[in-house]
Each structure stands twice: as structure tokens, then as C-alpha cells.
Amino acid sequence: MEEKYVPSAVEEKWQGYWAEHKSFKANEDPSRKKYYLLEMFPYPSGKIHMGHVRNYSIGDVIARFKRMQGYNVLHPMGWDAFGMPAENAAIQHKSHPAKWTYENIAYMRGQLKTLGLSYDWDRELATCDLDYYKWEQRIFLEMYKKGLAYKKSSAVNWCPKCETVLANEQVEDGCCWRCDSPVQQKELEQWSFRITNYAQELLDDTYKLTGWPERVLTMQRNWIGRSTGCEIDFPLESGLGKIKVFTTRQDTLFGATFMSLAAEHPMALDLAGDAQKAEVAAFIDKVKKTDRIKRGAEDLEKEGVFTGSYCINPVTNTKMPIYLANFVLMDYGTGAVMAVPTHDQRDFEFAKKYNLPLKVVIQPEGETLDPATMTEAYTAEGIMVNSGRFDGMGNADAKEAIADFLEKEGIGKKTVNFRLRDWGISRQRYWGNPIPVINCDLCGVVAVPEADLPVVLPMDAEFTGEGGNPLARVDSFTTCTCPQCGETARRETDTMDTFVQSSWYFLRYCSPKFSAGPLDREKVEAWMPVDQYIGGIEHAVLHLLYARFFTKVLRDLGYCNVDEPFSNLLTQGMVIKDGAKMSKSKGNVVDPNALIERYGADTARLFSLFAAPPEKDLDWSDQGVDGSYRFLNRVWRLVYDVLPVIGDAGAVNPGELGAEAKKLRRAVHKTIKKVSEDVEERFHFNTAIAAVMELVNAIQAFSAKDAPENVAVVREAVESVVRLLAPFVPNFAEELWFQLGHASVLEAAGWPGYDAAAVVDEEVTVVIQVNGKLRSKLTVAPDAKEEEVRAQALADDKIKPYLEGKDVKKVVYVPGKLVSIVVA
């Protein structure tokens, strides 16, 4: 064994061994319990960063731990490879997105391999591979046939910098989630997936996901946003139609005094009288340019315009002026709000500003509200007033009664509404999966026949950064023949949102080379669902919601038998340096390559796992990295020093051990127990590593390492350290295991079990309190009888002075921990 630890030599040796022997190749094996471990796959941006190192190290610990426990582990890796950055890089470097992407994949694959991550590289996939995206086109066509994919004109979020559409979930504080540019509203024909068909199931199944963080589930439930209420028809005064309203507050219907419409409402301009036409048109234009998030904010300055038209309150028969209001959104309910200013604060502020009538219909029991003196809306529970036959009822009861009344009278109906909107997947970019449809002047939208798939991205597109979608300018791609009528037609030039590719990749990993369809159902059933998924919480209502939706769709299409893709979810924290998330713009990035070159991959892994629990943010510390490196050197030196002595040691005979040797063995088995629990039950890798560090200290402090009767205990202790470290620092541990004389690798050795008898302390320390204050301590046997411990405590020399002249009222014993004496 070399005296000095040389990380590069150790890592090169064992990474070569694992690659040569395909050590982490997963095969279906019904005789073993499966475990599917997956981290969210990366975008091939060019280089891995410390966030990647941490995320993938966390996953690798779990994968290696499960293998050592005997599980059949699937741990794949791939690349979320379509997307705008590749196109932007092509413009900047005058190259092609494919070249940039595949070069980055090759480089980042090499980086990941240097970390010693236990991936089954035979299952590697990239979403830009034709062999991947062609099957996605097949899935699209099946969704189209089922009515789950459709095209329509609608107001969309438009990023002027990326020159593409964004889904609602991709707009953050009014800006593009990718480039941070202000988002505009634009009317476009676009393709969408009918995720709303699955809204109720997506909501219901969140209550089955017991292995997910509650925070993520709450975010999804809020995004889906189920609300129950009524749809109510308000006839136009002109008699030429009606306005349909969804409300959850039908109990306030008698207090509705005006109507508010979203600027995007299809009737908005039609309702404008000749005198109001110009003002209404200008208002519509202004509001459409305003960010939706700002329009929904409580502190928004309320603005509106009178259309010149009126509708009729169907229960009071009073005229209600119809306004357009900047705070009403078209994507909630029907885009029309019955305004009840006395019982809704936004309506109250609007009514005060535009001098609109107020009518109280709910008031506190025993009190009378005067609209003339109200300074804010009354939104609490109360008693119904000014509401006809419903007067005197509690408003909660009146909700149901009024809903029944509306249905009976044919004025409205009970209904359920969801905040969730269909997923717009059209993107006006080249580097994405082509949507497999053809636009024909005679036949309209025509699906590409399955026999003509795949629709392949042309490689001769030009990337100038101007003129929108490069794909639309490739005549050889866009010009085609209609498969129905045979006339010249135009191929769809929108590509799919990259979140489509990441919505089913975890299923494709089960059979990545399958050539007869998107998924091999038998293999999907063998591996799915993913047992542990790991990724950032920023994907709570993007990727994680879409992946759940897609899994349910593929189930209904017959491709799989699972309802939910991920049984357990871990959302890891960020890597922080100098008080901020690492980023190039902040100049606080640590290059993993430089770190690995100086300290080795295992030090990088150890620090990222030891510095904080996985779900918490990790504060970068150069001293912490040094400390991790020093610890590995200490363990290496320990093995080097004891190896000549323990080389031929046999099994431990607990009955022949002296007191100090028993103490060391107890520490060994307590550590095995703690590390096992910390890794398996809590993923508290930091405390697990700390426990191993304490064990190393105990071994080094054991003075009789050389004594013949102790060599077996020392060998057991040292080997336990190596086995416990194996998931965290695999290259390092594998080499020490080899040096300890083992012919097989650590996975074959398995995870160590602990001796239950060995972890029992021969003595425990019991503290003694008098009237709640610590006064002394006792050392007793762990199974000591209560009477004996109480007697010892009362007879303790340090306790006696506190008892003299006092009446002992109570003595309470908490076994193995505490004696509490109460005196007066």
C-alpha cells in the first residue's frame, strides 16, 4: 500500500475498473427487489457546476447504498438537450445547435465520469437524438387522435427576446423564466395539450404522494386551483345575448351592482357603444400589454372603462353597468366578474373610484352595515340581508340554497372551476422536436401519417438571430405534399416545448434501445415508478406537474400501468457562495474541474455531502473542502499504519475482549446503526459522515491496537469505516478495501449490519435534578431497577445538602436519563 493518498491515481484506477466491468449495468431481475434512483437530467450547457456535483453526489450515495443492501438498482443518466441556448450559441459562434450540443454532452459526460458516479451509461439518452424524439412525435399523434392535442388561436405569453411563446408556468414575475425579459401578450395560433382533462386526477393524486415534500404538493394544489361555485347567466339589457359568470360567492349575488370584464373577453369591444368605442379599444390595448402577474396583484391600482352597455342581475332585475377592469383575468373562470363591492375588496376599491352603487347583503349578526360609511369590504361570515327569501340565513347555508335556487330557475348551475389552464407547447424555435402536422389550404390541419414519421429536423437551417424561427425559412422542410389531397402544403414549423421531452424520459430509460415503440411495457412495469427522484424545487409546477400529466396520458394510451411517476421526491438546496447562489454573473463560481484536480473527486463529493443536509442550501467553504481532504488523508494513514498488524486477524470473539476493546466495538456498532438510519430514513448524510469521523477518532485513540487480543476488533473497526464510507467516497473506499486484502468489490461485501448486543451500553449516565436544577450525575447499569437508582440518587453526597431539612415531595425516574427530585 502506498503511504500517501494520491486521489488521481486511485480514481483513475477504480473508474477504469467500473467502466471495464460495467459494474453499474442494470438488468431486470425478478428475484431481487428493484430500486429506481433518478436525478433530474441536466441541460448540456457546457460544463457541470457545483450544483450538479452536489445533486448527483446525493443520488449516487443512495444508489450505492441500495446496491450494498442487495437491491437491483437502476441509476441512469441522459441529457435534456433541446432548447434555446443551443440556438443562441449557434448564432454567436456561427455554428450549428447540434454541433454545440453534442460537443457539450461529450465534455460533460467526461466530467460526470470523473466524479465516480455509478450510472448505467448503456442507458444514456439525449432528447435531441432522432431515436428519442421520433417516438415523442408518435405520442403527439396519439394524443391528437384522442383530442388531447389541439390547435387554436389564443392570447399567449410572448418573449420578445427569445421570440417564442411561454406557458403560464414559464412566466416568473412577469418575465421570461429563461432570459428574464418582460413578457408580452400576443394573439397566436398555437398547439396545446389538454392537461385540464386531468385536473381533478392530478389534484386527487397529490394526496397519495406521501413521499413528496408538503411544500411541493401545496404549490401544485394551488396551481391546479380547484374551486366550487356556480355559473350564472346575466342577460344583456339589449336582449342580444348574455354574460356568463363563474363565482364561488353566489351568496352575494343579490349585492352585485356592476359587471367587470377582462380586456381579453370576446364581448369586450362588441359591448362598446359608439361614444365609448375609441376609449374601450385604447383600454383593451393598454391592459393586454400589462403583465398578468401585476394584474392579479392585490396592490394594483384599479383601472377600468365603462362600455356603455348594461346587463341585468337575474335575481334583482336591476340594471348593472358593464365595465372593463384591469384586474380581471381571462384565464380564470369566464373572464367576467359579477362585482359585489360591499363584500369584495377589489370591487370595493373599483366602485369607490368610479362612483358605483354599493349594496350590503351580508352583515355581522346583531349589527347593521351602512354602505355610506363603509371604509372597506365586509368579507367575513354573517347573516343574509336584502336577499329576498334568503334573508336571515347564515351566508354559508345560503350558498347552497342559492345554488339550488339558480339551478331550479334555470338562471345558473353548480360547477367546478380550475385555475389550471391547458399547456401551450408551441415554440417558434428551430432546436426542438418538430410538431408532426401539415397545414393544407384545402384540408386544414392534417396529421403526418405514422408511416411518414419521423419528421426530421433539417440540418441546413441558417442562424442569424433575426427574423424569428429559422425552421420557417427552410423551404425544403416547410414545403410538402398534403397526405390527404396530394396538393402542395406547408409543414408545421412550431417545435415542442422542451418540457415535453422531460415529461417522459424517465419512462424511456426503462427501455432506451427499444425499437418497436416509445416504451417496452414489460420493462416499464419492471422498473416504474421511480423510487427516489431528486431535483430542484423550482420545478414544482413545471416539470413535476407535466411529468405527472404525461405519465397518466401514457397510461391511458396503454404504454404503462403506473398512475404516478415518482414515489418519493427530494428537493435539494442550492450551493451558496458569498451569500448568493453560484453564478457566472456574480463571479462566485467554483470550477469543479479545478477542485477535482487539486483534491480529487471524493473530496468534492465528501464536502458537498457533509456541509449541509441535502434539502438545505449549502454554504461554500474553502476551509470545509480542506477539512474533507484532511479527513480522507487521516483515514488513509490509519489503514496504512494498522495494516501490518491486522492483516491476518480473524473474527471478533466478544467474550474475550477487555473493557477498552469492548468500548471500541460498541462505538463501531453504534456507528453502523446510526449511519444506516441516517442514510436510509432521513438522507442526513452530514450527520452520517460526522458519525464516521467520530469512529475514526475512537480508533486512533485506542491505545492497544497492536495487542494480539485486539487485532480482530481493530480490523472490524477499520473495515467498518471503509464500508460505511463507500457510498460517499467510492473511489477512495474501494482502494482501501482492496488494500485490506479483499478480492471482491465493496458492493459484493454488502452494507454492514450491527450487532444489537454490542450497541447496548454497559453503563449509562443519569443526571440528577433538584427542583429542576442539575446538581449531580450517576453512572448505573442500563437495566438498573428504579428503586436502586432512586436510592443512589438520594444518597449521593452532592445531593444530600439540598435535601437537609427539606421534605422530599416527589422523585421521578426517566430510565437511563434522569432522576428528578422535588423538595419543599
Curated annotation (Swiss-Prot):
It catalyses: tRNA(Leu) + L-leucine + ATP = L-leucyl-tRNA(Leu) + AMP + diphosphate. A motif ('KMSKS' region) lies at residues 581-585. Pfam families: Anticodon_1, tRNA-synt_1, tRNA-synt_1_2, tRNA-synt_1g. A motif ('HIGH' region) lies at residues 42-52. This is Leucine--tRNA ligase. GO terms for biological process: leucyl-tRNA aminoacylation. Its EC number is 6.1.1.4. It is found in: Cytoplasm. It is an enzyme of class 6 (ligase). The keyword Metal-binding does not apply. The gene is leuS. GO terms for cellular component: cytosol. ATP binds at K584. One of its GO terms (molecular function) is ATP binding. Belongs to the class-I aminoacyl-tRNA synthetase family. Keywords: Aminoacyl-tRNA synthetase, ATP-binding, Cytoplasm, Ligase, Nucleotide-binding, Protein biosynthesis. The keyword Ligase applies. Its main location: cytoplasm. InterPro entries: aa-tRNA-synth_I_CS, aa-tRNA-synth_Ia, Leu-tRNA-ligase, Leu_tRNA-synth_edit, M/V/L/I-tRNA-synth_anticd-bd, Methionyl/Leucyl_tRNA_Synth, Rossmann-like_a/b/a_fold, tRNAsynth_Ia_anticodon-bd.
